[in-house]
Regions:
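Bacterial Sec-dependent N-terminal signal peptides
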Residues: 1-21
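Primarily recognizes the serine-hydrolase "nucleophile elbow" in alpha/beta-hydrolase
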Residues: 133-205
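Hydrophobic alpha-helical packing residues
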Residues: 74-82, 226-231, 271
Length: 278
């Protein structure tokens, strides 16, 4: 009996949320930084697949990736709703981790004007800015690769977008601003992730969904500023600022005790309202 239990446990990883990895044709990372950029593809069961795909850009301050919470758990949730999840391993700046971080100024949500052009990066420096650009190239390559495999993966080419968490939101925003037709997302969602560079809204900007917490310093103000940039350009944007609960947000138990735990349901409802899922 014990042998049977052990054998069944060995097969658990193979039957739970199987995924494939694909390397991206982008620049190799610097020595000591991250692994080669790649995507991990999590596909829903074919009988519930609705043709929508989301490239997940995990957070981690551009120094690590919050993979378990922002990709693995989120992919499982999305697959349950028939959505393909594409985890993105993008360029990082790991070599900066041992140098310490200067404490940035703390900007309250009531002062979005503190971030002209919605640039909420409190500590610009050459190496950090270049990493953001490299990560944005990875994100654009991810969208292109999903479109190339769209028929194989049962994905609609006009239903591929981003969901960025924290720094990953900044990566997704940067990618959206400089994308060509093949790289352009159909939608852009950022969860407590403001822009890390000056925002220039593209002429054909995708619909934007923003979620954040009111008392999140810098982030909330930066995201209000991002919303305003999108609206000033005449683009479609929706902003949700939660007043309670802890952030940043990952998938939460639905206890009914906070409003922040409803963000994942809000995401699904928004995708339905925009016609990306049935």
């Amino acid at each position: 009996m014990k042998k049977l239990v052990l054998l069944s446990m060995l097969f658990l990883p193979l039957t739970s949320l199987a995924q494939k990895q694909y390397y991206l044709p982008t620049a190799a990372p610097s020595e000591g930084d991250n692994e080669r950029p790649m995507i991990e593809v999590y596909l829903p069961k074919e009988d519930i697949a609705n043709g929508c795909a989301i490239v997940l850009c995990p957070g981690g301050a551009m120094r690590w990736l919050s993979w378990e919470s922002d990709v693995v758990k989120m992919a499982s949730f999305l697959n349950e709703h028939g959505i393909a999840a594409i985890g993105l391993r993008y360029h990082l700046n790991k070599s900066q981790m041992s140098q310490g971080m200067q404490m940035p100024s703390m900007v309250d949500v009531t002062h979005p004007e503190a971030f002209p052009q919605a640039d909420a990066n409190p500590m610009h420096h050459a190496s950090g800015d270049s990493i953001i650009q490299l990560a944005a190239q990875d994100a654009k390559a991810a969208i292109s690769m999903v479109r190339e495999h769209a028929d194989e993966w049962h994905i609609g080419k006009d239903k591929i977008g981003y969901l960025g968490f924290s720094a990953g939101g900044g990566v997704a925003i940067a990618a959206t601003m400089s994308a060509d037709d093949m790289q352009r997302p159909s939608f852009l969602c950022t969860n407590f992730g403001p822009s890390l560079m000056p925002v220039t809204v593209p002429d054909d900007a995708p619909p934007l969904l923003i979620m954040t917490r009111a008392d999140h310093p810098n982030v909330a103000a930066g995201l209000v500023a991002l919303f305003m940039e999108w609206k000033k350009a005449g683009a479609n944007a929706e902003l949700h600022i939660y007043g309670d609960g802890k952030g940043p947000y990952e998938l939460m138990p639905q206890t009914g005790k906070t409003t922040t735990e409803t963000w994942s349901g809000l995401l699904i409802q928004w995708l339905k309202a925009k016609g990306f899922i049935n």
